[in-house]
Amino acid sequence: MRRRTLLASGSALGAAAMAGAWMFGETRGGGPAPVVPAAPAGAERVEQRASAARGRVVDFYTAVPDGHGDGRGLPVCLILHGGSKRPPDFPALGLGRFLTDAVRRGAPPFVLAGATGDRLNWRPNGADDPQRMVHDELPAWCDARGFDAGRLAVWGWSMGGYGALLLAETFPGFVRSVAAFSPAVAPGDAVFGGVQRLTGTPIGLWCGRDDGLYDNVKALHRALPAEPAAGGYRAGRHNFGYWSTEVAAAFDFTAAMLADPGSGSRGPAAGAQ
């Protein structure tokens, strides 16, 4: 696990400024281009699933590290995307290649799985409930593929980082760990309001120092019930040029949290309805 770097913070940004940063920052220019490892992707699939929680058909992405066949029996890292990306974009982001690279560097193998969330958040919105999709349906879809849905972690960036933290707060014990890149949080929001419910859940927290959300993320860091188990802060903006430099550390952290088959508190079909 990469040693975390914890730096000093300034004051928190206002909620309005935060919203503009995370809605548009993923495609904002500046900074280096994303760096993707040379390792080959294993089996990557984008399929369609009918989501009762969302009331629509969604894209369902899965990735297995190269050399691990169909991934049967492997634990799962759930992916919560940000506002400008969707599951069909994940192969082009190199997520399957990052996964193989992590395993080739010695990380215990796991699979990635994600589905289409709402463009602006991962919270219930009337009859459209992407959070319930992640909690109730996504593990069942993974279980049907033969993955070990009793061992789950979650990783998200920007809006998806917010959603990953909120998921862990709403359903304590559902995931073994949370990895959040530049989560779109602000003091006083639902994540800050439920932060004590993260007690006992290892958190990895990363953010670029040039990100408009940096002060908010540092405020969240201070509010957490325990120090982050992984993460850090260095030069970088709210885009994949920065995030791509932290995926390796996040996957190493996630793999370590998922590695023990006997420590999970959730059965393979728990939460599925």
Task: Please name every model-derived segment.
Residues T5-Q273:
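Non-catalytic cap/lid and distal C-terminal segments of serine-dependent acyl enzymes
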